[in-house]
Design a protein with these regions (language model features):
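Extracytoplasmic/periplasmic ligand-capture domains
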Residues: 69-70, 90, 96-132, 201-207, ...
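A structural signal for short loop-to-beta-strand junctions that line the ligand-binding cleft
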Residues: 53, 79-83, 152-155, 211-215, ...
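Boundary at the C-terminal end of the N-terminal hydrophobic targeting segment
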Residues: 26-28
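N-terminal lobe/hinge region of extracytoplasmic solute-binding protein
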Residues: 34-86, 123, 208-210
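Surface-exposed binding/hinge segments that line
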Residues: 127, 131-191
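Bacterial N-terminal signal peptides that target proteins for export
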Residues: 2-14
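A structural "hinge/loop" feature
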Residues: 38-54, 78, 105-108, 174-184, ...
Length: 306
């Protein structure tokens, strides 16, 4: 993956979009990111595209555990510590205290994060009887594709600040699984309020999370505007406003970058790479992707084998 950055006194950026929350200089007030497209929604449980994750799970939500930026090392997130049973089948997570939720025009939280939110976030994906399971299409491709409905026997609340995952078998990468975008934690209190109001889909369209930014405005195919969340439990953002300027054409993204209309752009055209490297005002960053692409034979059709 390649990310291009406009060098200026207002911006310092690490290896991923997450770094925007911690690496901008103190002088920076607004950071504009030329996104490559509109998100499919704002609930990362329901989608699989990186474009959607960049706009939802990264700025808006947290997970029990996280990946250390630029690595696959698992570090504490909403869970400050955890234990694994000797048989490798029970994971006990101890939640951080004092983690606050965003709010919006329709909902004001009355409590902080607790174990009910964690249980709800996974039960929605696993349990076909959960009232939210079929809301917004009810497609949980990552959760189901990774075999988690069969792996996770139970997610249970021990107390307000402790939650347990009971597995059907030991699973070495389970912690890393919980650091992925689809494992973002949503508010059960907000979900209950929207269900009671008869508008459950708003949970997925008007997001409320615990992340460093909260959603202010979304204009499809135009822009997304976020503001720094004053109550964020982690390292405070060093910018006040984050704007996604939705720009599908890579050439247009590059032109905006050159004019400083945006300070960050992903996925430049390969033909532009050489020019970018020669431009001292642009910092071109490269990092290996985690996805693997391949071609395979279709062995399900007999006539293709003759």
């Amino acid at each position: 993956m390649r990310i291009s950055l406009k060098k200026s006194g207002m911006l310092k950026l690490g290896l991923s979009l997450v770094a925007m929350t911690v690496a901008a200089s103190v002088q920076a007030k607004t950071l504009v990111y030329c996104s490559e497209g509109s998100p499919e929604g704002f609930n990362p449980q329901l989608f699989t595209s990186g474009t959607t994750y960049d706009a939802s799970s990264v700025p808006l939500y947290n997970r029990l555990v996280e990946f250390k930026i630029g690595t696959t090392e698992v570090i504490p997130g909403l869970a400050e510590k955890w234990e694994v049973s000797e048989d490798g089948k029970t994971y006990t997570f101890h939640l951080r205290k004092g983690v606050k939720w965003h709010d919006n025009k329709e909902f004001k939280p009355t409590r902080e994060l607790n174990a009910d939110d964690v249980v709800f976030s996974f039960d929605r994906q696993k349990n076909a009887q959960n009232p939210y399971h079929k809301v917004s299409g009810g497609s949980y491709e990552y959760f189901e594709g990774m075999g988690l409905p069969e792996l996770i026997s139970e997610v249970k609340k021990v107390d307000d600040n402790t939650v347990q995952f009971v597995l059907t078998r030991p699973e070495a990468p389970f912690l890393a699984d919980l650091a992925m975008d689809f494992a973002s934690i949503l508010s059960k209190e907000y979900a209950d309020a929207m269900m009671k109001a008869g508008t459950p889909e708003k949970l997925d369209l008007n997001p409320i999370g615990t992340g460093p930014f909260q959603l202010q405005q979304y204009q499809k195919d135009s822009r997304i505007r976020y503001k720094a969340f004053d109550g964020y439990w982690g390292t405070k953002p060093q910018i006040d406003t984050l704007v996604f300027s939705i720009t599908p054409d890579a050439s247009v993204r590059y032109a905006k970058l050159q004019k400083n209309e945006c300070q960050v752009m992903p996925y430049p055209n390969p033909a532009d790479i050489a020019r970018m490297k020669q431009d001292k005002s642009i910092n071109l960053m490269e990092m290996p992707g985690l996805n693997v692409g391949y071609l395979s034979y279709n062995v399900q059709k007999n006539h293709l084998m003759t």
